[in-house]
């Protein structure tokens, strides 16, 4: 829900596909584009991103500027025109500027009455006056109910990201733990996305790290396999996980079907909240084994109990009276907002995460929280209970909308006493601390950017830094990569990798590889600029055109990059910096190169140098990871490359079915023919390739 800036405030919630009218959005309401160093402590010069938090604080518009009467009158006239045609029924409205950018999306029980409040000549706060002054068009869609309007409003806000709405940022899906249900020996794995595979899903967890740690501990406690089905089917002896007691070895019959089924049941019970009963069962078995002098078995049960205790110790608070709930708390400071979310499922704490929604300074905590909730649950199933730190307007309307989405009752409340109040207070403390850390990190990053600009002689601190590197082994599996950093840290959703495509490259020709990467990147960027799109910011307000391009290499790499930009007519528009490693590749002894300037040497403890090293190392980490994936794929498919008529799709099908190249080689013609997409002729060709006849 996004709070309406007029007399009455709106709420919004996520629209399920079956709750809107048959034509919920008219053709004219299809989504549109949104508008778009010396005193630094060296220890603070590193860019860090907590996986549980957003990486960046949003840009906050200055709402103190007065609005001229002329534009305000024009905007009111446009709104008055819309009022004359507006219905008195529920609906959603959108305000657009002269460039056809959506400024604001709102909903109302009575659209005509709501729009009339904007047409008043006086009584608006500066933020609303600025919005009215920029408005030239108002679009309206009627809905059957106010709840339907609320759902549609939240959906449109997430799609269009209007400037004057509260915007949820970095809204990626949460990871779950899945115990599969489509194999006789269920697998435990991390899952993100649509829950289409049969099995039991547990979560959401606040971060991938929390899921990975929990799965590792669950493997130690319950010995449930984590391997893929194809790997499972290809085993002829137990793998390493069996040897280190993190799997029971069902693949090779080390445990029988009833025994493995019991392990899976215990794991499911533990994740379902019956942890005390599971621990009691294991304790009884440990005592029994000890009494029977089976000390090795008793030690195994002891280790499993310790793994369960480790999981629970990581969860921190585990409420006694709350079975399934999400807890939201908001704290505002310095014009920014932080919403901390805790997830409780089956009476267990599955972690927490901090969000920093984009909202103008004049929004109250209640307004930001209400709008945040609607967008948050747009693509997530709501729990039975939602606890809030602040009372929000139209709380009942939001609860009704979430009930429609979930197909069951959803309660939304701001508790005043008891354990629920304590949970909210704990979340509020975390929100306050998270925002404090983020403000401090942002201030440090700002000083680093200023120091970098001073050191390199830039006209202003860079808003977008791109760093390039490439990786290969004697020219094979060559890949280039670009990472992006801004005033608030790394912007990982804008990282890019480039598979080197040029034929005839001399193996190991780093200059040619860098030229190809930069040509592909800046040709695309120059084309976008010619069309007028390159200057427009992305959703997170980061400009698309870099202020500084850093190349991992010395003067030669720098000249190669400069040549590419000159060929494209961009030589004067991009600042280049080459970073050459020191003697013996020692950190702290790097040399910096810029076109037509003497080499720059910084003191080893200079925070600006440390900052540049961190940027270079992040690019190196990213490109090495991309190269390893390519190499792993190449090694895995080695041996299938030479079979005529077997392309990438069939290779993947064969490897998915058999797991390894050795199993493909062992397969009979009949087994090969069972693979989806492999015809009888292809099966014969594959078999003959691995089993050539005499002569």
From Swiss-Prot:
Where would you find this protein in the cell? Cytoplasm
Which UniProt key words apply to this protein?
Answer: Cytoplasm, DNA damage, DNA excision, DNA repair, Excision nuclease, SOS response
Residues passing through the membrane, by range: none
Gene3D superfamilies on file? 5' to 3' exonuclease, C-terminal subdomain, GIY-YIG endonuclease, UVR domain, UvrC, RNAse H endonuclease domain
Compositional bias, Low complexity, is annotated for: 18-27
Domain spans labelled UVR: 276-311
Q: Which GO terms describe its biological process?
A: nucleotide-excision repair; SOS response
Q: Which GO terms describe its molecular function?
A: DNA binding; excinuclease ABC activity
The chain's disulfide connectivity reads: none
**Is-annotated flag, keyword Cytoplasm?**
yes
Q: Where is this region: Disordered?
A: 1-53
Q: Which domain of life is it from?
A: Bacteria
- Record-level GO cellular component terms: cytoplasm; excinuclease repair complex
Residue ranges with Basic and acidic residues bias: 1-10
**Coiled-coil intervals:** none
Q: Where is the GIY-YIG domain?
A: 88-166
Query: Is Signal one of the keywords?
Result: no
Regarding protein family, the annotation reads: Belongs to the UvrC family.
- Assembly and interaction partners: Interacts with UvrB in an incision complex.
**Function field:** The UvrABC repair system catalyzes the recognition and processing of DNA lesions. UvrC both incises the 5' and 3' sides of the lesion. The N-terminal half is responsible for the 3' incision and the C-terminal half is responsible for the 5' incision.
Q: What protein is this chain from?
A: UvrABC system protein C
User: Which organism's genome codes for this protein?
Assistant: Rhodopseudomonas palustris (strain BisB5)
| Encoding gene (name) | uvrC
């Amino acid at each position: 829900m996004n709070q309406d800036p007029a007399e009455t405030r709106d709420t919004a919630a996520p629209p399920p596909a079956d709750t809107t009218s048959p034509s919920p959005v008219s053709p004219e309401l299809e989504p549109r584009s949104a508008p778009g160093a010396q005193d630094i402590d060296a220890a603070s010069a590193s860019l860090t991103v907590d996986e549980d938090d957003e990486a960046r604080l949003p840009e906050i518009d200055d709402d103190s500027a007065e609005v001229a009467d002329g534009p305000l009158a024009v905007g009111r006239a446009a709104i008055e025109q819309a009022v004359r045609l507006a219905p008195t029924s529920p609906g959603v409205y959108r305000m657009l500027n002269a460039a056809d950018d959506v400024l604001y999306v709102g909903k109302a029980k009575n659209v005509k009455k709501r729009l009339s409040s904007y047409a008043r000549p006086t009584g608006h706060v500066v933020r609303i006056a600025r919005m009215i002054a920029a408005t030239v068009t108002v679009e309206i869609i009627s809905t059957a109910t106010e709840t339907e309007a609320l759902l549609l409003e939240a959906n449109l806000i997430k799609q269009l990201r209007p400037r004057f709405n509260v915007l949820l940022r970095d809204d990626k899906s949460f990871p779950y733990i899945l115990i599969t249900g489509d194999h006789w020996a269920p697998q435990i794995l991390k899952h993100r996305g649509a829950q289409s595979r049969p099995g039991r899903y547990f979560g959401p967890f606040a971060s991938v790290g929390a899921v990975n740690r929990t799965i590792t501990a669950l493997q130690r406690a319950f010995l449930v396999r984590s391997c893929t089905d194809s790997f499972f089917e290809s085993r002829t002896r137990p793998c390493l996980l069996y040897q280190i007691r993190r799997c029971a070895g069902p693949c090779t019959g080390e445990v029988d079907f009833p025994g493995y089924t019991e392990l899976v049941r215990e794991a499911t019970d533990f994740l379902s909240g019956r942890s005390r009963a599971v621990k009691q069962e294991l304790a009884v078995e440990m005592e029994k084994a000890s009494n029977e002098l089976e000390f090795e078995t008793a030690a195994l049960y002891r280790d499993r109990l310790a793994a369960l205790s480790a999981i629970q110790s990581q969860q921190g608070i585990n409420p006694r009276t709350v079975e399934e709930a999400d807890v939201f708390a908001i704290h505002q400071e310095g014009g920014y907002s932080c919403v901390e979310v805790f997830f409780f499922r089956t009476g267990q704490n599955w972690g927490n995460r901090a969000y920093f929604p984009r909202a103008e300074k004049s929004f109250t905590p209640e307004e930001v929280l209400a709008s945040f909730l609607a967008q948050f649950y747009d693509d997530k199933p709501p729990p039975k209970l939602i606890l809030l730190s602040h009372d929000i307007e139209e709380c009942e309307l939001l609860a009704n909308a979430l009930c429609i989405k979930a197909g069951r009752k959803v309660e939304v409340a701001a508790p005043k006493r008891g354990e629920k109040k304590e949970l909210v207070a704990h979340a509020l403390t975390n929100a306050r601390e998270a925002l404090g850390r983020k403000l401090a990190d942002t201030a440090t990053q700002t000083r680093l950017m200023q120091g970098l600009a001073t050191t390199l002689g830039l006209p202003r601190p860079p808003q977008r830094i791109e760093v390039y590197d490439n990786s290969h082994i004697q020219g094979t599996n060559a890949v280039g990569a670009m990472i992006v950093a801004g005033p608030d840290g790394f912007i990982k959703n804008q990282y890019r990798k480039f598979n080197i495509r040029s034929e005839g490259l001399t193996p190991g020709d780093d200059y040619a590889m860098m030229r190809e990467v930069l040509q592909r990147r800046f040709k695309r960027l120059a084309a976008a600029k010619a069309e007028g799109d390159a200057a427009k910011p992305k959703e997170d307000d980061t400009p698309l055109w870099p202020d500084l391009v850093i190349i991992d290499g010395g003067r030669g790499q720098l000249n190669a990059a400069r040549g590419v930009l000159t060929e494209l007519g961009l030589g004067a528009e991009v600042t280049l910096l080459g970073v050459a490693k020191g003697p013996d590749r020692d950190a702290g002894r790097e040399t910096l190169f810029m076109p037509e300037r003497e080499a720059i040497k910084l003191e080893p403890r200079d925070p600006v140098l440390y900052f540049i090293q961190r940027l270079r190392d992040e690019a190196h980490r990213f490109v090495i990871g991309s190269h390893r994936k390519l190499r792993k794929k190449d090694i895995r498919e080695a041996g299938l490359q030479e079979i005529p008529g077997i392309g990438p799709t069939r290779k993947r099908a064969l490897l998915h079915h058999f797991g390894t190249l050795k199993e493909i080689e062992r397969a009979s013609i009949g087994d090969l023919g069972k693979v989806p997409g492999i015809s009888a002729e292809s099966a014969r060709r594959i078999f003959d390739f691995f089993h050539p006849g005499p002569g």
